[in-house]
Amino acid sequence: MTQAAANPAQATPPTPRPGFRIEKDPLGYLEVPDGAYYGVQTARGIHNFPISGTRPHPALVKAIVCVKKAAARANMATGRLPKQLGNAIVEAADEILWSPPARDDELGSDGHSDPMRAGFQAARLAKQAELIDNFRIDPFQAGAGTSHNMNANEVLANRAIELLHVSGVGSGKRGDYAVVSPNDHVNMAQSTNDVFPTSMRIATLDLIRDFIPAAEELIHAFEQKSREFDDVLKSGRTHMQDAVPIRLGQEFAAYALTIRRGVERLQTAGQSIAEQNIGATAVGTGLNAEPEYIELVVRNLAEQTGHHLRGAENLVQATHSMRPMLEVSAALRGIAVDLVKISEDLRLMSSGPMTGFGEITLPAVQPGSSIMPGKVNPVMAECLSMVCFRVIGNDTTIAWAASAGQLELNVMMPVIAHTALESLTILTNMSRAFAEFCVTGIEANREHARDLMERSSALSTPLAPYLGYALAADISKQAVRENRTIREIVIERGIFSAEDLDQLLAPHELTEPGVAGGFRFTPRLPEGYKPPTGPVGAGG
């Protein structure tokens, strides 16, 4: 592509090179590839923003096409857009939004594949892929997403031109905007400033809808393991030091609930982005958008997306404030922070296998070292942490971008959309992968965990209500000093029998609210020692 021809005063278009056509915008003439469904303004955007080498998120592409379809339907209903043109725009949009039917729907009445139907599906898939491939604007682009909006306008206009030609209308040549105009027809009653934020919010809602079942898979995996590990007694740890016992199942149940609470907060945040500013046009005043159109386009979007969308209470506020996206990102950050904590816990509990905690074994999914034979690393947990670090970083980007708007518009929306959609995508994929390749295959090293717990000096804590803090502390110090267990020393001193200790230190006695043993046991205390009259608290 050459930008040299951009001359608005030039009276006649230059001759294009082979394989190109000439289009004109307010900056002048420009070559556009013959086979492109995009047009001159997209071509300028491609030329101006070769930043990341990536393209718009697929969810954002489908969302903006969905907005264009809803707008065309609304404009036809108000009588402003001729139905012949509007229907062509809607048909072009449907080619991009089309979803392949379920596999069973491709079978004929005899239960075998229908070649004609299969060929039709293949042709639709090919056309859909071709059209989506024409969305080329880098996520780091012109402020507010103008290039992305025009990319959608041009692709739909050029495809509508072809569809109308099949019906005998127009030349059918891409770039013949006298037939269907990207601005006057596809963008009718719209501005980038209401199209892009609406598209961004719908795409985010779509990906939240995808994330929820993935998160549920992860929650379910932890819940299953919590039941499986409910009888596995292990040492708790605070400050990275031995603490009172806990059941491994309790830890896994807490992980499941932690994730569920995060998902609930995300769903609450998602309600705020159900409010759409479509109809706001440029600055939120709704200039050039009829009230009837605004009501219809929101209704159409709700119908097309399946989301419970609503029009903004105040279009000016909804246009300049990015608070709803900030709330979604903050909820994602919260989930990510919790998942890092869980990941680090699992890595610690699985550390070793011979010189670490070794209380659990994570599934071996690939060799861990190119130099140390037989080494296996907690790669899924490591990957989870890295994904979450990215989400946390994306939230920082969104916070800065949300704060950077001026007056009636926040022009940083493209980076907000890009990072929010990336966060949802990688968290969704990671949740499924972590559930499948890690959590479901975790094994508890029961005997080893029990042995470590038995050697913990913190086992003096359930004895404190019977013995008092001072005597329990003395026993704990002796255990550490002599590298022996609390059980051994208590039995040696004759304070409790082995049988009493078996009941007193049973898993559920140690890991449920209340005093272990419920004061059912009487210790043999040193002569002259006065036992406590009730439970004695011991801080951690």
Named regions from a protein language model:
Residues 2-540:
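Conserved, well-structured ligand/cofactor-binding cores
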